[in-house]
């Protein structure tokens, strides 16, 4: 995807999406609970499907129930003490944001050297396939995405500007918009706009 950092954006025609966004925009988040069938397996969120492909032990991502609740085995892998398991799982499940659990698990795998290394292009191609599956199969989420029309989409990451100002670090997946400029590479936003365009094309070609 084309780099987005430094791009000029009309703030009146820009839409932020993230796990805590007000409904229905929260459905655009990868953490949102929605069943994804990918490569012969079923996952409770797009984040689960994506992170599973990066894990040396893909089966770890089958240790969640259909709604993303962690099993005791998965809790152990993530490193949650038993007394914190239910609080963590219940909090994110109530918010329909079970994908955060997949993020926690891959972070643990990275610490243990169990995370596969993929190129930027490989990760983007993987996300394209998974996101297309999400929005093709979930008509409600698809409508939310298509209803953004031609708005500039960006995954809001609050720390983007602070990190850039402090040490020049450019956030890869998300961004902020500051004074009409994108601060961060916003690759997830770019992917979402790519998916939106492709879905529109598919719908227009239907008889």
Pin down the residues of each PLM region.
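Charged, low-complexity intrinsically disordered segments
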Residues: 1-207
């Amino acid at each position: 995807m084309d780099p987005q950092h430094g791009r000029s954006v009309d703030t009146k025609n820009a839409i932020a999406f993230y796990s805590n966004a007000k409904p229905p925009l929260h459905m655009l988040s990868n953490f949102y609970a929605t069943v994804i069938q990918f490569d012969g397996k079923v996952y409770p969120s797009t984040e689960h499907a994506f992170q599973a492909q990066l894990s040396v032990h893909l089966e770890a991502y089958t240790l969640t129930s259909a709604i993303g609740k962690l099993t005791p085995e998965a809790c152990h892998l993530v490193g949650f003490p038993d007394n914190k398991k239910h609080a963590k799982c219940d909090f994110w499940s109530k918010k329909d944001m079970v994908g955060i659990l997949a993020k926690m698990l891959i972070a643990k795998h990275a610490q243990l050297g169990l995370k596969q290394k993929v190129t930027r292009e490989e990760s983007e191609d993987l996300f394209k396939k998974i996101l297309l599956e999400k929005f093709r199969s979930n008509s409600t989420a698809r409508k939310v995405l298509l209803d953004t029309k031609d708005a500039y989409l960006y995954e809001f990451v609050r720390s983007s500007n602070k990190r850039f100002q402090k040490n020049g670090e450019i956030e890869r997946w998300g961004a902020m918009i500051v004074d009409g400029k994108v601060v961060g590479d916003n690759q997830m936003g770019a992917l979402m706009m790519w998916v939106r365009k492709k879905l529109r094309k598919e719908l227009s070609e239907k008889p």
